[in-house]
Design a protein with these regions (language model features):
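Glycan-association/targeting regions that enable binding to alpha-glucans and other polysaccharides
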Residues: 1-154
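Short amphipathic alpha-helices and their capping/turn segments at secondary-structure boundaries
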Residues: 12, 140-145, 208-220, 294-298, ...
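Hydrophobic faces of well-ordered beta-strands that scaffold small-molecule active sites
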Residues: 151-153, 222-224, 304-306, 403, ...
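Substrate-binding/active-site clefts of carbohydrate-active enzymes
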Residues: 157-220, 227-397, 425, 431, ...
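Active-site rim elements
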Residues: 197-200, 280, 376-379, 407-413, ...
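Short, well-ordered coil/turn segments that N-cap beta-strands
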Residues: 218-220, 298-302, 398-403, 433-437, ...
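Active-site groove signature of glycoside hydrolases
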Residues: 310-312, 386-414, 516-518
């Protein structure tokens, strides 16, 4: 009886196979529509989209209606035949359920159509399975819901709005990179080529004054370039991580003297600057103003993220004190440049142990002596200090909603150390504010940092700014190169987008910072003129000559 049943089953399979063959011979089968095949990591096709270990996940796959014979969900552990769970608008939807363990869950789809077997992975349809292209689930990796698809507005504070002229940097207040600070009197003046010491007066009060405007624009997240104490207008050379620069905040205690005159370039004589940036009343008043700003931003239902520059600091930094600003100030220990006995000596790497006092032999990031590289491997105290900084600003009373991390992959002196630091940084920040985002500046493949225990996402250069710029303008994002072969090249554009989007994973992709341009690159509108060059040798006029606003509108629409 059992043998008869087995023989009958085998006969039925043979009949079905013959039927399929006849359908091909008679051209009765519908054409296989591989373009209809689809799945991704969004909540519609994966529920929950960001599962934790132990969760049961429903995974779905789409085909054209009545167009395939079977669909299988294939993982490293099992091959499960999926069942049709619905039909809508000419599509069949297949589903299967899996339980997620502690480890990364990788999967792909196997589609059978008559004699044809193909596969679907993170890159789309393929005829051969490639494991590196599988969909991936990192258990417990979730990104803040508020950041998914949010409209972000970047503010380079000094160039936004001068809301409080009493805190403006004045001409000759101090000396920096070869010359004295300059107070720009005319807001519309074109910035100098070496404009890091030119100040237009933008500040936090200016942002406060324009919140109605920003809200009316539909801004949901404000991203501020660095705001901590610093001698430059870009402030990627931090002087004190614990305080907002009083030139952006409040100056309640000032010095009427102490401007550098004539050839004097000794910042230990810059009494006005020293008073402004070391007096605790100014520093605390500036932090209080920032707390008021963040509270008002949150009251309006908006978010705010800060720029964290933790790979390096500035030569003015109180830990280094190359300018001897803190050397004789009460309450400040000697900087590592000043004394071999400084408590901060191990915060930096010095190449000449016999060069004190005033040791200039420290390592600078990319050899810039104004940007001392922080030596985390040499100081657990520094390591813990920066973790506390990460926590401080996302906690009360500031309650910032996250960090943009400058040159994040450069931190430390090895890849292993870099990854360990960002794992600890994530734990510290998320413990203080679970809904804070950790968004890194990164060029190249970020996969190694996007596994759920380091960064949430990145500034999306590779999967947005770069390919879109080449496609619409033929220009490199700094305006350093023009390639006519990439202008309007849809094949190159789609290929680049698919390749680089795969590296981000869906949670990171949904929260990535998609910009057309920013402070590190030429303006997108400038790129539409197809002119290679920079202000330093092409002149400022070249940036606006022959631009094409229509292309800019296309980019904004995308």
């Amino acid at each position: 009886m059992i043998n008869d049943r087995e023989d009958w089953t085998e006969m039925e399979h043979e009949k079905a196979d013959i039927k399929k063959r006849m359908q091909y011979i008679l051209n009765m089968r519908p054409v296989f529509n591989k373009e209809a095949l689809f799945s991704d990591g969004t909540e519609y096709y994966r529920t929950p989209a960001e599962p934790k270990a132990g969760d049961t996940v429903t995974i779905k796959f789409r085909t054209q209606r009545n167009n395939v014979d079977s669909v299988y969900l294939v993982s490293q552990e099992q091959r499960v035949q999926m069942e049709i769970c619905g039909t809508e608008n000419g599509f069949d939807y297949y589903s299967a359920q899996v339980t997620i363990g502690e480890d990364i869950f990788r999967y792909y789809f196997e589609i059978q159509y008559g004699w044809v077997t193909c596969y679907y992975n993170n890159q789309g349809v393929c005829m051969k399975h490639e494991g590196r292209m599988d969909f991936e689930i990192y258990p417990g990796f979730d990104t803040p819901k508020w950041a998914k698809g949010a409209v972000m507005y970047q503010i380079y504070v000094d160039r936004f709005l001068n809301g409080d002229p009493t805190n403006d940097v004045v001409t000759g207040e101090y000396h920096y990179i070869g010359d004295k600070s300059v107070q720009v009197e005319q807001w519309n003046k074109i910035p100098a080529v070496m404009g890091v010491r030119e100040f237009y007066g933008g500040d936090l009060q200016g942002i406060m004054n324009k919140l109605d405007y920003l809200q009316d624009l539909g801004v949901e997240v404000i991203y501020l370039n660095p705001i901590f104490v610093s001698p430059s207008n870009h402030k990627y050379d931090c002087q004190d991580y614990d305080y907002v620069d009083p030139h952006y905040g409040r100056i309640v205690e000032d010095c009427n003297e102490g401007i550098l005159l004539g050839d004097d370039d000794d910042n230990s004589h810059a009494w006005k600057y020293i008073k402004r940036v070391t007096d605790k009343k100014n520093l605390e008043a500036s932090n209080e103003l920032f707390a008021k700003l963040t509270a008002e931003i949150h009251r309006r239902g908006m978010k705010i993220i800060l720029d964290g520059v933790f790979n390096h600091c500035g030569s003015f930094n109180k830990w280094m004190d190359r300018e001897r600003i803190y050397e004789n100030q009460e309450g400040y220990p000697k900087g590592a440049y000043v004394s071999a006995d400084s408590p901060y000596r191990n915060f930096f790497s010095f190449n000449d142990p016999n060069a004190w006092p005033y040791n200039t032999s420290y390592d600078g990031w990319w050899a810039h002596d104004t940007l001392p590289k922080l030596n985390y491997e040499g100081s657990r105290e520094l390591y813990d200090y920066i973790l506390r900084v990460g926590q401080k600003w996302v906690s009360a009373p500031y309650n910032v909603d996250g960090w943009r991390l400058d040159v994040a992959a450069d931190l430390g002196h090895s890849n292993d150390f870099n990854h360990q630091f960002w794992k600890d940084f994530r734990k510290a920040v998320k413990a203080a504010n679970p809904n804070a985002i950790i968004l890194a500046e990164h060029y190249g493949n970020p996969e190694g940092w996007l596994k759920g225990d380091e960064w949430d996402t990145v500034m999306n250069y590779d999967a947005f700014m770069e390919p879109l710029t080449w496609f619409l303008t033929g220009m490199e994002k700094h305006s350093d190169e023009y390639r006519e072969d990439l202008l309007g090249n849809s094949e190159a554009f789609i290929g680049a987008m698919k390749t680089h989007m795969r590296a981000l994973h869906m949670s990171a992709l949904q929260t990535a910072m998609n910009e057309l341009s920013n402070h590190d690159h030429s303006r997108f509108l400038t790129r539409t003129n197809h002119r290679v060059g920079r202000i330093s040798y092409a002149g400022p006029e070249a940036a606006s000559e022959g631009v094409n606003p229509a292309v800019m509108r296309e980019a904004v629409t995308i």
